[in-house]
């Protein structure tokens, strides 16, 4: 399903049916030959802030930002209080903005940082949970190469029964049946389309959908469902993965057993 010129869900404004995924075309520019595990993973080419820089930004963010969503949006409709989103720095974007992410941006701060609309983050977490609840747990793959995304991605997978690959994504994991670590998931969740470019590329090759946590500097042409969020901050990623796990379990009729503290990694 990935590989559309625009984000899959929003390009058509239609509901996604997991049963249709085999009928979707694979991106013509994607390499289709089987890949062997190699020492050099594909390098991301987009410039982005480091995890440490984002951690510093999120620490300063809540004092500067109170206007993080449209006035007509009620705080009562959110999964958690808006103050909790603020405290985690979920709303803090980068100083770069792509056209793909413009619709998820609420405003720009005086220091040049873009502020993401947390009501859209909240909405997309629910939508992503709707999608994931249609899949068998073991057919969901969470992938995160980003430092602060690894621990919450592992906890997310543990909570919902999914598979997980953190750190360097070995080429051929989804495309080379001869590789010992080869797996065949039906959907992939990634922390960052830039850092997790190899996982996204292979998902496109095999024709499975991609849910991605995207910051203001991300492009989304190979993403089927965007969850707009600060995808570099430790606390922000913990909150988003925790909410996504709980909402997915809720739609399965299961009781969440993890608290936010369980998703927060040590610095």
UniProtKB/Swiss-Prot annotation:
GO cellular component: small ribosomal subunit
Pfam name, any one: Ribosomal_S2
PROSITE patterns: RIBOSOMAL_S2_1, RIBOSOMAL_S2_2
Acidic residues biased stretches: 10-72
Keyword match Magnesium: no
Signal peptide: none
Transmembrane residue ranges: none
Region (Disordered): 1-72
Gene Ontology terms for molecular function: structural constituent of ribosome
Modification after translation, per record: The N-terminus is blocked.
InterPro entries: Ribosomal_uS2, Ribosomal_uS2_arc, Ribosomal_uS2_CS, Ribosomal_uS2_euk/arc, Ribosomal_uS2_flav_dom_sf
Matching Gene3D superfamilies: Glucose-6-phosphate isomerase like protein, domain 1
The entry's keywords: Ribonucleoprotein, Ribosomal protein
Gene Ontology biological process: translation
HAMAP family attached to this UniProt entry: Ribosomal_uS2_A
Similarity annotation: Belongs to the universal ribosomal protein uS2 family.
Protein name in UniProt: Small ribosomal subunit protein uS2
UniProt source species: Haloarcula marismortui (strain ATCC 43049 / DSM 3752 / JCM 8966 / VKM B-1809)
């Amino acid at each position: 399903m990935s590989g559309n010129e625009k984000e899959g869900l929003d390009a058509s404004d239609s509901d996604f049916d997991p049963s249709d995924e085999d009928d979707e075309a694979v991106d013509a520019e994607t390499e289709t030959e089987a890949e062997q595990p190699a020492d050099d993973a594909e390098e991301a080419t987009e410039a982005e802030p480091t995890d440490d820089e984002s951690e510093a930004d999120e620490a300063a963010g809540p004092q500067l930002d109170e206007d993080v969503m449209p006035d007509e949006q009620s705080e009562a409709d959110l999964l958690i209080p808006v103050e909790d989103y603020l405290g985690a720095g979920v709303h803090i974007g980068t100083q770069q903005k792509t056209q793909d992410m413009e619709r998820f941006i609420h405003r720009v701060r005086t220091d040049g940082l873009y502020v993401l609309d947390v009501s859209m983050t909240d909405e997309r977490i629910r939508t992503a949970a709707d999608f994931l609840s249609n899949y068998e747990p073991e057919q969901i793959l969470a992938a995160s190469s980003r430092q602060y995304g690894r621990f919450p991605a592992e906890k997310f997978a543990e909570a919902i029964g999914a598979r997980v690959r953190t750190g360097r994504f070995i080429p051929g994991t989804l495309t080379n049946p001869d590789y010992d670590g080869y797996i065949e998931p039906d959907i992939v969740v990634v922390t960052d389309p830039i850092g997790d470019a190899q996982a996204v590329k292979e998902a496109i090759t095999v024709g499975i959908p991609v849910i991605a946590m995207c910051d203001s500097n991300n492009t989304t042409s190979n993403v089927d469902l965007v969850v707009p969020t600060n995808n570099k901050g430790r606390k922000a990623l913990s909150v988003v993965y925790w909410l996504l796990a709980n909402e997915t379990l809720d739609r399965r009729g299961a009781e969440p057993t993890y608290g936010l503290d369980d998703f927060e990694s040590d610095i």
